[in-house]
Amino acid sequence: MGPQAAAGRMILLVVLMLSAKVGSGALTSTEDPEPPSVPVPTNVLIKSYNLNPVVCWEYQNMSQTPIFTVQVKVYSGSWTDSCTNISDHCCNIYEQIMYPDVSAWARVKAKVGQKESDYARSKEFLMCLKGKVGPPGLEIRRKKEEQLSVLVFHPEVVVNGESQGTMFGDGSTCYTFDYTVYVEHNRSGEILHTKHTVEKEECNETLCELNISVSTLDSRYCISVDGISSFWQVRTEKSKDVCIPPFHDDRKDSIWILVVAPLTVFTVVILVFAYWYTKKNSFKRKSIMLPKSLLSVVKSATLETKPESKYSLVTPHQPAVLESETVICEEPLSTVTAPDSPEAAEQEELSKETKALEAGGSTSAMTPDSPPTPTQRRSFSLLSSNQSGPCSLTAYHSRNGSDSGLVGSGSSISDLESLPNNNSETKMAEHDPPPVRKAPMASGYDKPHMLVDVLVDVGGKESLMGYRLTGEAQELS
């Protein structure tokens, strides 16, 4: 073979090498390209708030989600894993830092796909020196009239929502704070600021108590507090203002209650009584009033002490008409008399006397013990089936002792005149005149009534005076 053959072989070898490179480039272009290196996390910092340490970092945006691994190292110790394969940018390292007064470091690396970045390391962190502490708790109470009690609560160590204790007098908490109380007093538009220091003798493991004397509690007070660690020179955050309103004397309020409450009860009782009295009187005004004529009858019946005797009705079959007596049959509307006879004059006089007795309402002449008047009257009602209205039989004497004439009307007079005379009954009636009594004989309080005499012939031969309906009332009924 000559030199030409050797040169041809060399050219062929070069072509094969170039084609192999081109094929490998095309194959890798179809797959996802991996970055030549994974970026390192930046700004790795350890922070602590109320002794709760946390390490945080920053990382650039990637097409794939990166995951991180965190390691912690304390002074004179080794690196230990705290958080592995997390996607968050913060990790709590409370469990790895057992002593807050010892220096600690943290480092973080990222992993994207199958490649990992280098570790990014934080600066030295001393929790008791560089950590932050929140404000203490505060509460105000009125202890006396011119004294306020301020309660300051130590900051708490809270990890994952659970309290791990308070920051007071323990090496694991590294802080014992000296508290300063700030008082803002608004007095008549002028704002006064004062400071009060809380002594350690006034504190325990939970709180500190401070008593503040004030001149008066009739103005507004606002109080806040903060603390400082004299060894580490760490100051807490200042608390929010807690204000107490002006003081009001409760004794004055109690006196007002004691005065107003009885007055209110008394007023309510008066109103209820007035309402009840008004309702009672309104019912009385609606009650039915009796006529004067019925009131006289009720009064006479009430004042009567003698027991009532039975009524004996004289019928036309057993008449007791005397020679000197006249039967007056009253029609429903009027009584018919002869105008020219002397008996009419006496009858008119008798009716006047009867009206006078009725108008006066006197019952003295009707009692059994009163002496007989010059004019004696005895009456009875004649009830008959063939008569349309009641009749009254009236006997009267003239003033000179002789019997007067007779006045009659209708057929009832002729029936009575045909009856035989009974002289013995006449004499008995003249010597023993029966007393007159009123008795209610009416029906219906809303109808007019007329005076009616009824003879009572039981025992003492008494006469009873009653009432009957007038013709006008009978027509209405």
UniProtKB/Swiss-Prot annotation:
Its main location: membrane. Glycans are attached at N61, N85. Residues 402-416 have a biased composition (Low complexity). Phosphorylated at Ser/Thr residues. Phosphorylation of Tyr-445 is required for IFNG receptor signal transduction. Influenza virus infection leads to phosphorylation in a CSNK1A1-dependent manner. Ubiquitinated after phosphorylation in a CSNK1A1-dependent manner, leading to the lysosome-dependent degradation. Proteasomally degraded through 'Lys-48'-mediated ubiquitination. Ubiquitination is necessary for efficient IFNGR1 signaling. Disulfide bonds join C83-C91, C128-C174, C203-C208, C222-C243. Residues 1-25 form the signal peptide. Belongs to the type II cytokine receptor family. This is Interferon gamma receptor 1. It comes from Mus musculus.
